Structures are given as C-alpha cells and as structure tokens.
Design a protein with these regions (language model features):
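Short, conserved beta-strand element in jelly-roll/cupin
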Residues: 35-51
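A short glycine-rich, His/Asp/Glu-containing loop-to-beta-strand
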Residues: 5-33, 39, 92-93
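Catalytic phosphate/metal-binding cores of nucleic-acid and nucleotide-processing enzymes, i.e., regions
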Residues: 2
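Ligand-binding loop in jelly-roll beta-barrel domains
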Residues: 74-98
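Short beta-strand His + acidic residue motifs that chelate non-heme Fe in jelly-roll/DSBH
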Residues: 31-33, 51-52, 77-84
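Short acidic-glycine-tyrosine-enriched beta hairpin
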Residues: 56-74
Length: 99
C-alpha cells in the first residue's frame, strides 16, 4: 500500500466548511501521493505544466494558465509533478461540508 501525504505544501486555513492549501512546486518537483476525501477545486497562482500520475498507473499532462480554476475528482489517489521550466503554484480549496 502506498504511503499518502498532504494534498498541498502548506495548510493555510481550515474550518468546518473548507480547508485551504497552498501547493508550490519547483521544476521537476512532485507533490506527495495523496487522496482528496472531499470535493475540491484549485486556482492556478503561477502557471505551468503538470503531469498527474494516478495510483492505477495512468497519467496525464496539463498546461495550466494563471487564474484557471479546476474542479478536481474526489477519491482518486494521485500526485502531480511540475514538468515545466518555471515554478508552479496553486491554491487548493477542499469543500468539507455544504454551506
């Protein structure tokens, strides 16, 4: 079984409704393997190219632009790697409970 880590680089805020993370990746740096147990979205704060690897062995490469908002999939084990030449960052918002 794969050891899972945090969904972001730094936990910024948490209450009963949301959890907000910062994710910062230098070129060729990867996040921890992780699982989002809730619905979530992320907002790109420094654009770049990410490779997403899933626990089932599949992967994808995505170009992400400044300010882009992406809804993520709850329940998939994955990690992302910055395959670009510049630093990449985003803000992740996990939706814990409905408002």
């Amino acid at each position: 079984m794969r050891k899972l880590g945090d969904v972001g680089t730094e936990l910024l805020f948490e209450n009963e409704f949301v959890r907000t993370w910062s994710l910062v990746l230098e070129p060729n740096q990867s996040s921890d393997w992780h699982l989002h147990g809730t619905e979530y979205l992320f907002i790109v704060t420094e654009p770049g190219t990410l490779k997403t690897e899933y626990d089932d062995g599949t992967e994808s490469v995505t170009e992400l632009t400044l300010g882009q908002i992406v809804m993520g999939q709850k329940g998939s084990i994955h990690r992302v790697t910055n395959v670009g030449k510049e630093r990449y960052s985003n803000s992740i918002v996990e939706l814990i409970n409905e408002l």
